[in-house]
Curated annotation (Swiss-Prot):
Alphabetical keyword list: ATP-binding, Calmodulin-binding, Carbohydrate metabolism, Glycogen metabolism, Kinase, Muscle protein, Nucleotide-binding, Serine/threonine-protein kinase, Transferase
Record's protein name: Phosphorylase b kinase gamma catalytic chain, skeletal muscle/heart isoform
Pfam families, A to Z: Pkinase (PF00069)
Native source organism of the sequence: Mus musculus (Mouse)
Active site: D150 (proton acceptor)
Region (Calmodulin-binding (domain-N)): 303-327
Known partners and oligomeric status: Hexadecamer of 4 heterotetramers, each composed of alpha, beta, gamma, and delta subunits. Alpha (PHKA1 or PHKA2) and beta (PHKB) are regulatory subunits, gamma (PHKG1 or PHKG2) is the catalytic subunit, and delta is calmodulin.
Top-rank taxon: Eukaryota
Catalysed transformations (reactions): 2 ATP + phosphorylase b = 2 ADP + phosphorylase a; L-seryl-[tau protein] + ATP = O-phospho-L-seryl-[tau protein] + ADP + H(+); L-threonyl-[tau protein] + ATP = O-phospho-L-threonyl-[tau protein] + ADP + H(+); L-seryl-[protein] + ATP = O-phospho-L-seryl-[protein] + ADP + H(+)
Length: 388
């Protein structure tokens, strides 16, 4: 067992060990490890986040105190939002001089990131379910003036029924009325333009809850396209793309999606925060609207006849389009296999199956490194403007 795998000694964490039996590691953070654990009285499975506030002994006393206060703030926010069906539930907490133990529900399906790596891209139907639940969570947070600041697929967990649970509130903050934030935190490819601007301009007024909506747009784009809208191997170029709001619904990956879903994504990815779509506004967008059951079932004779006529016309049109479809020849497949949707999905799926394991959590790693759909024209124009 390496030092990173070692557990806190039983003497300092006696109360925790009396109630829980820690098992294998599920994930790691900068100063924390997440393990599966068993609640001894009930044999129920949970996940415990073990936070070393000393950084393995490398932190100064000021850094230890800062991390301790940040952890207590995370616990406080989790308790304030307790009970929401799409937020991870904090079941128990333990504290020693050097460690925190935060016990959560165990989400066996893992992260949305891993599910996306397996599926490559999601359909509009799957995306609608996930994004509606995420936006409802954000509505709840923002009504309490809580900004998450680290929304990304790695921090969205899935239960056995594919329902989401938002987790990792380590960067979260509850704002006072009129308060603005200035500190730079989060994951680079999900940062809102105003966060980056704060790091470059001492006179910047700061940012607020709108940063979560930008990250939501990046998540939604990523679910549909398979890679984020802003990415470059040179991080400075990527940050420049974010600040300029330069992204595209490129072909062929966006050819099969509706204009409605593209419109919603574009309402999130607006550089000016005051013009960005809020969570409540997004939930009212046509992408999330459903037919009212009573209205659907109410047919008039005239309406029935109209539906029959339209169905016949559509069937005839589909039939003739099918008859006119050119056969896929060997030459077409050799020349541009990626232009054919079935082959495109097959190629992407096998690429992720072979290489997806190394595209994971590090800030220098990104899905786009493996599944690069970013239009080259955008990158070239940026490179010409400024040499990094």
């Amino acid at each position: 067992m390496t030092r990173d795998d070692a557990l806190p000694d039983s003497h300092s964490a006696q109360t925790f060990y009396e109630n829980y039996e820690p098992k294998e590691i599920l994930g790691r953070g900068v100063s924390s490890v997440v393990r599966r654990c068993i609640h001894k009285p009930t044999c129920q499975e949970y996940a415990v986040k073990i936070i070393d506030i000393t950084g393995g002994g490398s932190f100064s006393s000021e850094e230890v105190q800062e991390l301790r206060e940040a952890t207590l703030k995370e616990v406080d926010i989790l308790q304030k939002v307790s009970g929401h069906p799409n937020i991870i539930q904090l079941k128990d907490t333990y504290e020693t001089n050097t460690f925190f133990f935060l016990v959560f529900d165990l989400m066996k399906r893992g992260e949305l990131f891993d599910y996306l790596t397996e599926k490559v891209t999601l359909t509009e139907k799957e995306t609608r379910k996930i994004m509606r639940a995420l936006l409802e969570v954000i509505c709840t947070l923002h009504k309490l003036n809580i900004v998450h600041r680290d929304l990304k697929p790695e921090n969205i967990l899935l239960d056995d029924n594919m329902n989401i649970k938002l987790t990792d509130f380590g960067f979260s903050c509850q704002l006072q009325p009129g308060e603005k934030l200035r500190e730079v935190c989060g994951t680079p490819s999900y940062l809102a333009p105003e966060i980056i601007q704060c790091s470059m301009d001492d006179g910047h007024p700061g940012y607020g809850k709108e940063v979560d909506m930008w990250s939501t747009g990046v998540i939604m784009y990523t679910l549909l396209a398979g890679s984020p809208p802003f990415w470059h191997r040179k991080q400075m170029l990527m940050l420049r793309m974010i600040m300029d709001g330069k992204y595209q619904f490129g072909s062929p990956e966006w050819d099969d999606y509706s204009d409605t879903v593209k419109d919603l994504v574009s309402r999130f990815l607006v550089v000016q925060p005051q013009d960005r779509c809020s969570a409540e506004e997004a939930l009212a967008h046509p992408f999330f609207q459903e037919y009212v059951v009573e209205e659907v079932r109410h047919f008039s004779p005239r309406g029935k006849f109209k539906v029959i006529c339209l169905t016949v016309l559509a069937s005839v049109k589909i039939y003739y389009q099918y008859r006119r479809v050119k056969p896929v020849t060997r030459e077409i497949v050799i020349r541009d296999p990626y232009a054919l949707r079935p082959l495109r999905r097959l190629i992407d799926a096998y690429a992720f199956r072979i290489y997806g394991h190394w595209v994971k959590k590090g800030q220098q790693q990104n899905r786009a490194a493996l599944f690069e759909n970013t239009p080259k024209a955008v990158l070239l124009s940026l490179a010409e403007e400024e040499d990094f």
